[in-house]
Amino acid sequence: MSSNSYQVSIPMSKRNTNGLPGSSSNELKTSAGGAVLSFHDICYRVKVKSGFLFCRKTVEKEILTNINGIMKPGLNAILGPTGGGKSSLLDVLAARKDPHGLSGDVLINGAPRPANFKCNSGYVVQDDVVMGTLTVRENLQFSAALRLPTTMTNHEKNERINMVIQELGLDKVADSKVGTQFIRGVSGGERKRTSIAMELITDPSILFLDEPTTGLDSSTANAVLLLLKRMSKQGRTIIFSIHQPRYSIFKLFDSLTLLASGRLMFHGPAREALGYFASIGYNCEPYNNPADFFLDVINGDSSAVVLSRADRDEGAQEPEEPPEKDTPLIDKLAAFYTNSSFFKDTKVELDQFSGGRKKKKSSVYKEVTYTTSFCHQLRWISRRSFKNLLGNPQASVAQIIVTIILGLVIGAIFYDLKNDPSGIQNRAGVLFFLTTNQCFSSVSAVELLVVEKKLFIHEYISGYYRVSSYFFGKLLSDLLPMRMLPSIIFTCITYFLLGLKPAVGSFFIMMFTLMMVAYSASSMALAIAAGQSVVSVATLLMTISFVFMMIFSGLLVNLKTVVPWLSWLQYFSIPRYGFSALQYNEFLGQNFCPGLNVTTNNTCSFAICTGAEYLENQGISLSAWGLWQNHVALACMMVIFLTIAYLKLLLLKKYS
């Protein structure tokens, strides 16, 4: 595979005199002339399941049918009604559609798309996926650090960032936070421009946008399209889907592709679309928006655009082999286009590129080569996650405050535990609460992967980082500190207020045990949450799991009395291991019958007077292994759950 054949973006490996990335002469020829994207006989089918559980049927649904066309440098709009297939076509062209059920060819300058096409091209999703707790500049720095080659110096990368900020008119808000639901940030238009800027960091020659005007008012939407028009004049091929643009936006289009029910209604110069529809008998009324007119024609819901048969015979040019009268409207329009001069001209031009279809193809969907190393990605992901943590006081500061308050409340309720029979119950109760509190506090870890799912999928597909870099980066910067710090605070507050065993070793064993419980529970939360799209579903599954685990923790029921066919469930209980370790740490060596000789006084034969007796009654071994086996079990569960979470992320469906 030669680099010249597959060049679709300005390369970053060389530098010119101004410090910005440069190119060789042959590569510049491709970049300067712009990238021409052609698509040949694109068909896309999906299998849809319907019916009830035992009567489910799988039906194959055709999303796109024999789509052909060419996208040249300029503004290339894909227009159509809801469900017409415009977003599907955009994803197919951008190599972001599930390859199963997909047929046809997409060529760049007559050559197959390279394996790293998704990294070389830019793709702006419909829902802006940027880190809201970071500033505009910090988001761009993250994109530059992971997508630009390491051969570029930090000074060159900063120059590139400043150039993009200036090009998109983000100078005034460059150091303002993008904003979240809790943090006031930039406007909707500035947020959309930030998303575009993230993709322009690599200076791609092809830029895809999925409905860039969604959620914007008419004035802001017009400003965004004017920006795209200005960018297209620099030689970029900009391809975007759009639903119903106003006329001031429509007149900016260079090329127009009309889709309905996955069929091609028109593909050609936007300025000639009205003339084409007039030639087949559909005239646009004066002062009517052409985009609205096209949708009215496709949907067949406007009698104003349909001429009478007499008028059509007099004024309209009949295409070759017109469809029958009883043919559905979509089929009629598709047949009209197939027999039009626009389609024939497109086929002639497509034949000039079809030579690349005969070449040996390289899969677009195989693993790409990243421009940065694992450690470099890990460092930047950890840095961004830590900034995001500090920028979310509701998730970080609030959790610490709640931990302090809860520790003080528990310390007040169980203050200064006595070494008497009541002390046994109180100790068991408070240790059980500490264990279960660590479990339920870890439910918040489900948001770690669910909230950022769309961001992760977009950045991973775009070649920002590896799955392993993202996973371990989140663990280092978010999971570890947010589970370790509360455990330390909780232990320091409650241990001395409760008056637990006055031994330094016991203090640190309790702290370590609470940390292990928190890590194991959080790992379980990640294993459940990975791949989930809704936080409430993952939270519900976590809560139900912990409720069952609590039953087998050792407090609510004596585990020695559980029937054999259910007793095996205790080995899957995180609270059981934490509770057993805390009991061993606290009860061993304690005497709860002060003043009595437990070896000679028969009054204690039916009572528990020592911690050792209590532990034996609970089925806890008095050997040193009786303590550390719980930590080993928690560590094994943590490794297993983290492995499951990583595999679920790795196998997550990353195509739309």
UniProtKB/Swiss-Prot annotation:
Disulfide bonds join 593-609. Signal peptide: none annotated. Keywords: ATP-binding, Cell membrane, Disulfide bond, Glycoprotein, Lipid transport, Membrane, Mitochondrion, Nucleotide-binding, Phosphoprotein, Translocase, Transmembrane, Transmembrane helix, Transport. It is an enzyme of class 7 (translocase). It is a multi-pass membrane protein. ATP binds at residues 80-87, 184-190, 211, 243. Residues 1-25 are annotated as: Disordered. Its EC number is 7.6.2.2. InterPro entries: AAA+_ATPase (IPR003593), ABC2_TM (IPR013525), ABC_transporter-like_ATP-bd (IPR003439), ABCG_dom (IPR043926), P-loop_NTPase (IPR027417). High expression in brain, kidney and lung. Also expressed in livere, colon, small intestine, heart, skeletal muscle, spleen, stomach and pancreas. The keyword Nucleotide-binding applies. Pfam families: ABC2_membrane, ABC2_membrane_7, ABC_tran. Residues 416-429, 499-507, 558-631 are extracellular. Gene3D superfamilies: P-loop containing nucleotide triphosphate hydrolases. The chain crosses the membrane at residues 395-415, 430-450, 479-498, 508-530, 537-557, 632-652. Residues 390-652 form the ABC transmembrane type-2 domain. It is found in: Cell membrane; Apical cell membrane; Mitochondrion membrane. N-glycosylated. Glycosylation-deficient ABCG2 is normally expressed and functional. Phosphorylated. Phosphorylation may regulate the localization to the plasma membrane, the homooligomerization and therefore, the activity of the transporter. Belongs to the ABC transporter superfamily. ABCG family. Eye pigment precursor importer (TC 3.A.1.204) subfamily. The extracellular loop 3 (ECL3) is involved in binding porphyrins and transfer them to other carriers, probably albumin. Homodimer; disulfide-linked. The minimal functional unit is a homodimer, but the major oligomeric form in plasma membrane is a homotetramer with possibility of higher order oligomerization up to homododecamers. This is Broad substrate specificity ATP-binding cassette transporter ABCG2.
